[in-house]
Amino acid sequence: YNFSDIYILYAQAKGGRLQNDFRRLETFCPYGQVSSQPDATYEQINAAIGFKASPAIGLWLNLYGGYQNLKDDLFFQPADLESAANEYSPMLSIGQWNTSNIYAGAEIRYGYKNVFSFSATGVYRNWDAKDDNQSNAGAYALVYKPAFEADLHIDVHPVSALLLNLGYRHISREKVEGNKVNAVNNLYAGGNYEFFKGISVYARIDNLLNQDYQYYWGYPTEGINFTGGVSFKF
């Protein structure tokens, strides 16, 4: 509902089937293993209400809250793999469980021509996983779920061919049985320079704070790390 040129009140509801094929499993957890083809995940509902505003040229605000319910949601947990020689090796197993969460978030974006842009987002989630059979699967399903996520990102174009960026990513995990995984705190910086049309060199430095955290169970993130390369656009 547009009650002025700069204010929008909205409501939305969506859902659908998420096929757990190889590509989605690799995106979810590149180290995870499955014993059989997982069932599709169904987003049974994802409903939200929100408020958007653009009080100044180039500035956008978005406040929202909602509820999401997922059937056969993916999660990973440590397990042991038994070999033919009855030897056990640690592994990361991908499982499924029904989860739901209530969320609330805010977003602010600002851009000045093609010279400078800034964005900041934050989302809080309160997760639940009903566990009727008293197994540990319900607890495992929530261990790496994000309780709060925050992103800050700045892009600067000092000249048209050069892009510099600086950002910060924070993820705090859901508390399960009185404990929670260390939060992700990734301060990063990067750049991209197009020296010929369609040909660019890029570089990025991650974990500038040299923090100890994990995106996947049992796989600690490296300290300060660097990537770079050449990209081609055809």
Q: What does each model-found stretch correspond to?
A:
Residues N2-F234:
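Exposed, low-structure sequence patches enriched in small/polar residues
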